[in-house]
């Protein structure tokens, strides 16, 4: 008898607690640290903070969803991701029709600049750059597919995309939490201004080394390289989960041994032994590029700091 009386009370209490949690603000989950950093900046001063699904040391290319992370997603009012070409481990979950209203896919936003993925090995001469307004540049047709749609999914490494993403985040949050709509939109504008200053500082820092040639671990940086006019010559892999074949390795070994490379960049999340084997055969500078900001503290300054950290790493390894 007591159990029959208590059960409705327990259910009512659970519903009340859940409602109170929602009354405290929207439950937001950002899939990767760069998205989390932008969202934290947009939510500053609202009394709410986003949750981070993947820590910076985990590559989204190689991630596997744990039960605790699945629970985070299940409880979220808003899930912010780059898109299915990056967070492939979420495809089966987030692409379900019932989740459409809860998911903000940043790579699909109007105004986002997408860069064509380049093949592993030596890059071809040319990169497509386009947005929803049809902006394109000349390119070669000899590239291999980078991801599902052939476009580089690392859209956050172009600061122009960072501005677009911040505005979209603010607009979506304003719908979920109208009481703080002005705060969200003001924060997005403030982040855009900080990115203006960051972009100017990076442009000045990298100007002396724009002509210096280098190799990267995987083709993740087309947005950053295109924005700042850099001179990459190739990538060891088109994507970390797809290591190059023997022909590509030989091609890259030849490039490195030619003496025309100022630096070879690896990544803290991914540092394959076969890259080290190639480097051991040659006297070439080695640097580290961190597209996810593994060493940076999370928070409102994370995203501008991530871009600046990339610039510093490039400058320090490429300078004569």
Identify the role of each PLM range.
Residues 1-2:
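N-terminal secretory signal peptides that target proteins for export/translocation
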Residues 5-17:
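Bacterial N-terminal signal peptides
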Residues 20-320:
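Extracytoplasmic metal-acquisition and chelation regions
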């Amino acid at each position: 008898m007591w159990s029959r009386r208590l059960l409705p009370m327990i259910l009512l209490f659970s519903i009340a607690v859940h409602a109170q949690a929602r009354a405290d603000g929207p439950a937001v989950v950002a899939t990767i640290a760069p998205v989390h950093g932008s969202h934290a900046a947009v939510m500053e001063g609202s009394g709410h903070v986003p949750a981070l699904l993947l820590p910076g040391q985990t590559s989204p290319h190689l991630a596997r969803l744990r039960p605790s992370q699945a629970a985070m997603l299940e409880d979220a009012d808003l899930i912010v991701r780059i898109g299915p070409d990056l967070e492939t481990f979420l495809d089966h979950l987030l692409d379900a029709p019932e989740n459409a209203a809860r998911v903000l896919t940043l790579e699909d936003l109007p105004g986002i600049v997408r860069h064509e993925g380049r093949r592993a090995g030596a890059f071809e001469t040319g990169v497509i750059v386009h947005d929803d307004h049809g902006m394109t540049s000349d390119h070669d047709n000899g590239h291999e597919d980078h991801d599902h749609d052939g476009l580089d999914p690392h859209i956050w490494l172009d600061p122009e995309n960072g501005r677009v993403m911040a505005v979209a985040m603010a607009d979506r949050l304003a719908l979920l939490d109208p009481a703080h709509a002005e705060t969200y939109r003001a924060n997005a504008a403030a982040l855009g201004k900080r990115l203006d200053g960051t972009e100017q500082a990076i442009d000045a820092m990298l100007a002396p080394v724009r002509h210096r040639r280098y190799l990267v671990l995987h083709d993740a940086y087309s947005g950053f390289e295109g924005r700042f006019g850099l001179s990459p010559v190739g990538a060891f892999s088109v994507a970390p989960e797809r290591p190059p074949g023997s022909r590509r390795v030989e091609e890259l070994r030849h490039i490195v041994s030619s003496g025309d490379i100022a630096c070879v960049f690896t990544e803290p999340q991914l540092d394959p032994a076969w890259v080290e084997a190639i480097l051991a055969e040659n006297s070439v500078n080695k640097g580290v590029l961190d597209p996810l900001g593994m060493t940076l503290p999370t928070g409102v300054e994370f995203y501008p700091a991530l871009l600046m950290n990339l610039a510093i790493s490039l400058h320090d390894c490429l300078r004569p």
